[in-house]
Curated annotation (Swiss-Prot):
Belongs to the QueC family. GO terms for molecular function: ATP binding; ligase activity, forming carbon-nitrogen bonds; zinc ion binding. This is 7-cyano-7-deazaguanine synthase. Zn(2+) binds at residues 191, 200, 203, 206. CDD domains: QueC-like. It comes from Staphylococcus epidermidis (strain ATCC 35984 / DSM 28319 / BCRC 17069 / CCUG 31568 / BM 3577 / RP62A). Catalyzes the ATP-dependent conversion of 7-carboxy-7-deazaguanine (CDG) to 7-cyano-7-deazaguanine (preQ(0)). Pfam families: QueC. It is an enzyme of class 6 (ligase).
Amino acid sequence: MSQNDLNKEKALVVFSGGQDSTTCLFYAKKHFKEVELVTFNYGQRHDKEIEVAKKIAKEQNLKHHILDMSLLSQLTPNALTQHELSIEDNDDGIPNTFVPARNLLFLSFAGALAYQIHAKHIITGVCETDFSGYPDCRDSFIKSMNVTLSLSMDKDFVIHTPLMWLDKAQTWALSDKLGVLDYIRHNTLTCYNGIIGDGCGECPACHLRARGLKHYLEHKGEE
């Protein structure tokens, strides 16, 4: 499908208010005629995530769907839904921030919503390059979900992953190319400890984000 064709289409962005999904929001605004957002409330570590997502959606004048997925917090204790747990890697190398089946469920419900609002395109900010040990962020999983969603609803869905092969520095570069680097830096919430913008500087998410920004700014203009 050509860019001219995409400009006539509708897209649904899986949106958390973090760096990656907000970059996807602006990517979608550039490439699609109509954009809506879906945020999942799954009892995440910080309610502030939902408030940040609402604020950004309002500022960008986009229709924002918030779906209750609180049942996820009942399935397994992990550091994204259980506030009292510290963030660390498990013995199998998968971080205890991993929520089993999260992206499987999120994309399933995003597909159901996309069906209802007549959106062919679903955009998610998952990324395999800065692989954090999450098996449901892999390209192979996304491709399988694309087929499954299309078959389950007899619709020709397209799942877009514009960040899949970008590292964090390249993700910052994309936001700069879209003209929103400063907006994303100061208004998004990536920090596991709930601090907006540059975050706490201590958690794994902040380290990854800060390292990527530093690398991008140091090498900006070299290519």
